[in-house]
């Protein structure tokens, strides 16, 4: 977190603002006692794997999987309530500065929360199989699941959306 804090702020601001340090310390007061540290670091590890060509190339070679040409598995910017976490931002899990955009950490985690919070991120469809193989290999197949959502649209909604996309007035 400390390294990420400097990576995010030193170049942009010349130093790490005290507000950022205070925010991270406040988040630690919830994360550590509630034992969410390992969970957040597991998500960081998955992100780190996807964004580190050497790790991707080595894993793919060991598993006999064709790696991406540049060794990077594209990820989304991180979505949902995790965007309110400065810790997640400094770890590179999310790409939106929660202080700059006025996002609340309490939406992500608070002392009353019992269940693990959602940290939504999207792995490129083209290379998702590599990410899933890494997670299963590292954390165990029994702990890996995929969720898919199917949406249906009415005829009227489809026509409306197509016309709107084509800039046809109502």
Would you name each region that the model predicts?
Residues 1-170:
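Alpha-helical scaffold/interaction cores of sigma-54-like transcription cofactors
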């Amino acid at each position: 977190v400390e390294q990420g804090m400097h990576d995010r702020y030193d170049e942009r601001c010349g130093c790490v603002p005290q507000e950022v340090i205070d925010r991270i310390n406040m988040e630690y007061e919830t994360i550590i006692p509630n034992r969410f540290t390992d969970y957040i670091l597991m998500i960081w590890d998955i992100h780190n794997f996807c964004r580190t060509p050497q790790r991707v190339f080595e894993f793919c070679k060991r598993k006999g999987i064709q790696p991406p040409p540049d060794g990077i598995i594209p990820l989304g910017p991180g979505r949902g309530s995790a965007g309110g976490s400065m810790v997640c931002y400094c770890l590179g899990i999310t790409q939106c500065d929660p202080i700059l955009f006025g996002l609340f950490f309490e939406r992500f985690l608070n002392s009353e929360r019992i269940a693990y919070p959602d940290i939504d991120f999207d792995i490129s469809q083209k290379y998702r199989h590599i990410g899933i193989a890494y997670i299963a290999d590292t954390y165990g197949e029994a702990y890996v699941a995929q969720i898919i959502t199917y949406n249906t649209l009415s005829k009227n909604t489809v026509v409306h959306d197509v016309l709107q996309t084509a800039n046809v007035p109502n």
